[in-house]
Regions:
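Catalytic cores of DNA base-excision repair glycosylases
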Residues: 1-209, 215-222, 227-228
Length: 231
């Protein structure tokens, strides 16, 4: 996906799920032929097109302003030049725009431009906190450089996807399926949960989760990501 498409898609993904993000993105592309048309359109039309993503009254003007700001600075909406910049310089360029936080920038850099960046979404933030890969009180913003320092750059892509999968299928926000976790022995949080459930009897153990597998392997997965939090 071109970087400008990835940028708009990721802004739409903030505080929603993949399905609603995709519905809004496809609606926007169907309504307007180019990003220049989105940039110059009546804001109400843009807002109406992206309603499936939620927070349309905030996201619509935000997307248009980012598109205008990029045009003012670059003369076009082509972001391919970012691929030639050092990753930190490219990250700084993206995050100077209102509504483009570290996660949004990292997604554009990693998934569109092939840069070594590690996006931290809700799932990654939760899982890495539980297994001790980050300090408990570390903010999401602080987690980006911290986690990048822990993983070799060539593993960012696969690690990002696999931790998200773990968070969605097993290490869920409420009542995680710790008994199915492939790294349970490395997780004090999970071991404590298992001990509490064992003390409470069989009713404390959650039922089987469709799609969750005890044999989950940490391997490279199909190219898909994104998440449900902001920035």
């Amino acid at each position: 996906m071109p970087a400008i498409d990835e940028l708009v898609s990721t802004i739409l993904s903030q505080n929603t799920n993949d399905l609603n993000r995709d519905r809004a993105f496809n609606s926007l592309r169907a309504k307007f032929g180019t990003w220049e048309e989105v940039r110059d359109a009546d804001t109400a039309e843009v807002v109406n097109a992206i309603r499936p993503a939620g927070l349309a009254n905030q996201k619509g003007p935000r997307i248009q302003q980012v598109l205008r700001s990029i045009t003012e600075e670059r003369g076009s909406l082509d972001l391919a030049f970012l691929g030639e910049l050092p990753v930190e310089e490219a990250r700084a360029w993206l995050t100077k725009f209102n509504g483009v936080g570290p996660k949004t920038a990292a997604i554009v850099l990693c998934f569109s431009l092939g840069k070594p960046a590690f996006p931290v979404d809700t799932h990654i933030y939760r899982v890495t906190g539980r297994i001790g890969l980050r300090p408990e009180r570390m903010t999401v913003e602080q987690a980006h450089p911290h986690l990048e320092s822990l993983f070799p750059p060539e593993t960012y892509y696969a690690a990002h996807l696999n931790i998200i999968r773990l968070g969605r299928e097993i290490c869920t926000a409420r009542r995680p399926y710790c008994e199915k976790c492939p790294i349970i022995k490395l997780c004090d949080y999970g071991m404590n949960i298992m001990s509490l459930r064992a003390a409470g009897g069989s009713e404390a153990t959650p039922a089987s989760v469709p799609g969750a597998s005890a044999s989950l392997q940490m391997k490279k997965m199909p190219r898909r990501r994104k998440n449900s939090d902001s920035s």
